[in-house]
Design a protein with these regions (language model features):
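Hydrophobic targeting/anchoring helices
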Residues: 1-89
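Acidic, S/T/G-rich, low-cysteine, solvent-exposed domains in lumenal/extracellular/periplasmic regions
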Residues: 78-266
Length: 266
């Protein structure tokens, strides 16, 4: 009977609260699969913003087997970005998200405020690199997400920014039972002025008593190759000053990492 009044198939026929304006604009306030279940002020405000302003539109590139928002693999971003039952997903926090396929043409990029390219596993074509280059030249926001050993196909895009991924993986002196490639990092002083959120993170990770750490199980270093006119602001730095870029060790659980400066580990 509900289908005669409203189509809730996209909501999985779950309980929702519908907000609707006179002009037909609609927004849903949902319940979530967590301990609190009910929406908080943040989720309600995000829903109301759909009536008051144009929401930031975030595109996730799905070409070349990149991490997708429509897939269900462990490596995909579908849960954190588009899951309607996850409170902190982008769609529940005031963002519009869209799957981006460059085969549809340049126009798909024109509608975006942010483009995320996350770990593609195949090379881009020359035409696609040109499309992404124009996107960067227009001053739009681009997020490149790579990790050790799988960043190769991001290199052409990094080159447009004058950057490159360093070979190897960041490690630090082993702490208790944790593997050496589990990097404990803190927010840099230069990053705290980016936004109020980064300022709060800086305070948490830099305080003298029991500082918190941002943990990354496997991270690659980034180096500047050339000046392409961008201002560079490092966001995170390793907490341990004895950390280095490891080029030899593969088994971080059963092996012990050792700095070998003779092969370029620094």
């Amino acid at each position: 009977e509900i289908d005669a009044k409203i189509d809730l198939s996209d909501e999985g026929y779950r309980f929702v609260t519908l907000l609707e304006r006179e002009d037909g604009k609609k927004a849903f306030i949902r319940v979530y699969n967590d301990m609190w279940r009910l929406p908080s002020e943040a989720e309600i405000s995000a829903a109301l913003k759909r009536f008051a302003m144009k929401l930031p539109r975030v595109g996730f590139l799905s070409d070349h087997d990149a991490r997708s928002i429509v897939g269900s693999r462990n490596r995909d971003h579908s849960y954190m970005v588009a899951a309607k039952t996850f409170r902190n997903s982008l769609i529940n926090q005031g963002f519009d998200v869209v799957d981006v396929n460059l085969g549809r043409g340049r126009e798909v990029l024109d509608s975006l405020d942010i483009l995320v390219v996350s770990e593609p596993l195949e090379p881009f074509t020359t035409e696609e690199i040109e499309m992404l280059s124009r996107y960067i030249e227009e001053g739009k926001n681009l997020v490149l997400a790579g990790k050790p050993k799988t960043y190769t196909y991001l290199d052409p895009l990094m080159d447009l920014l004058g950057l490159r991924f360093e070979p190897g993986v960041l490690v630090q002196r082993q702490i208790e039972e944790y593997p050496s490639n589990l990097v404990l990092s803190r927010v840099t002083e230069s990053a705290k002025d980016i936004s109020r959120y980064w300022e709060i993170l800086y305070g948490y990770t830099s305080r003298a008593f029991r500082p918190l750490s941002l943990v990354m199980p496997g991270a690659a270093a980034i180096a500047q190759e050339s000046d392409k006119g961008f201002q560079l602001i490092p966001l995170l730095e390793t907490r341990d000053s004895s950390g280095w870029n490891e080029l030899e060790t593969i088994d971080f659980l059963n092996d012990t990492v050792r700095l070998n400066s003779s092969i370029g580990e620094v």
